[in-house]
């Protein structure tokens, strides 16, 4: 465990969350990032930061929670993957002032920064403007706003679901 020279990991966290704000409120990027946890282990040599114990990461309208949140950096010191594990882990973001908060749940939530991709694994659920998507695994492309839901092949799941369950609300007609 090392606590020396932790600024690259902290700046990396800022970059990771800041880039996920592309679909969040415009003011979110300018907000400070706050990490609350019972403990933190920062290893600059390996490029890994692990936060444990009721972890809450917030920036503006974006919130990520879990029992454990891990950040991994690439060789250049940029955050590559943010992983939250919980019972369940939780992610929320307000995409626009006139939109409802998008909520996402999963026993594991992975955010692949450079790929603009959020992966929810095991008991995965997304709630967006009254629509719900549930399944073993949900992959959300934050840049293209595409949701893929299905089986979590190659992953052990606690509650196998052979099928996805989606509820899509009818569009409201303009009056």
Swiss-Prot record:
**Where is this protein chiefly located?**
periplasm
Its cellular-component GO annotations read: cell outer membrane; outer membrane-bounded periplasmic space
UniProt-recorded Gene Ontology molecular function terms: glycolipid transfer activity; lipopolysaccharide binding
UniProt keyword annotations, A-Z = Periplasm, Signal, Transport
Look up the signal peptide feature and give its range: 1-24
Gene3D superfamilies recorded? Lipopolysaccharide (LPS) transport protein A like domain
Q: Where in the cell is it found?
A: Periplasm
Outcome of gene disruption: Essential, it cannot be deleted. LptH depletion affects cell envelope stability, and almost completely abrogates the ability to cause infection in a G.mellonella model of infection and in a mouse model of pulmonary infection.
What happens on changing residue 135 to R?
A: Cannot complement E.coli lptA-depleted mutants. Exhibits lower thermal stability
Q: Which residues form a coiled coil?
A: none
Has the keyword Signal been applied to this entry? yes
Instruction: Extract one GO BP annotation from the record.
Output: lipopolysaccharide transport
Q: Which Pfam families match?
A: LptD_N
Give the residue spans that cross the bilayer: none
**Misc. comment:** Can complement E.coli lptA-depleted mutants. Can functionally replace E.coli-LptA in the Lpt complex to ensure cell viability, although outer membrane biogenesis and functionality appear to be partially impaired.
Q: What does this protein do?
A: Involved in the assembly of lipopolysaccharide (LPS). Required for the translocation of LPS from the inner membrane to the outer membrane. May form a bridge between the inner membrane and the outer membrane, via interactions with LptC and LptD, thereby facilitating LPS transfer across the periplasm. Binds LPS. Important for cell envelope stability and essential for growth, cell viability and ability to cause infection in different animal models.
Oligomeric state and interaction partners are given as: Component of the lipopolysaccharide transport and assembly complex. Mainly exists as a dimer in solution. Tends to oligomerize already in solution. The protomers follow one another in a head-to-tail fashion throughout the crystal lattice, yielding a continuous fiber arrangement.
Q: Which family does it belong to?
A: Belongs to the LptA family.
For this protein, the record's PANTHER family field holds:
LIPOPOLYSACCHARIDE EXPORT SYSTEM PROTEIN LPTA
**What HAMAP family does its record include?**
LPS_assembly_LptA
Share the domain note from the entry.
Answer: Adopts the canonical beta-jellyroll structure present in E.coli Lpt proteins.
What name is this protein filed under?
A: Lipopolysaccharide export system protein LptH
Provenance organism? Pseudomonas aeruginosa (strain ATCC 15692 / DSM 22644 / CIP 104116 / JCM 14847 / LMG 12228 / 1C / PRS 101 / PAO1)
The lineage, from the top, is: Bacteria, Pseudomonadati, Pseudomonadota, Gammaproteobacteria, Pseudomonadales
């Amino acid at each position: 465990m090392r606590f020396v020279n932790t600024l690259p990991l902290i700046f990396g966290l800022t970059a990771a969350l800041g880039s996920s704000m592309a679909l969040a409120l415009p003011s979110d990027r300018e907000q400070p990032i706050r990490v609350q946890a019972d403990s933190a282990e920062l290893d600059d040599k390996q490029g890994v930061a692990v936060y444990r114990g009721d972890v809450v990461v917030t920036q503006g309208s974006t919130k990520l929670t879990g029992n454990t949140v891990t950040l991994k950096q690439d060789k250049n010191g940029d955050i590559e993957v943010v992983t939250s594990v919980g019972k369940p882990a939780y992610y929320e973001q307000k995409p626009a002032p006139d939109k409802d908060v998008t909520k996402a749940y999963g026993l594991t939530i992975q955010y692949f920064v450079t790929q603009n991709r959020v992966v929810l694994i095991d008991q995965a659920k997304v709630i967006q403007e009254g629509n719900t998507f549930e399944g073993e695994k949900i992959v959300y492309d934050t840049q293209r706003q595409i949701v893929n839901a299905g089986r979590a092949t190659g992953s052990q799941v606690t509650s196998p679901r052979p099928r996805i369950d989606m509820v899509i609300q009818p569009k409201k007609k303009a009056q």
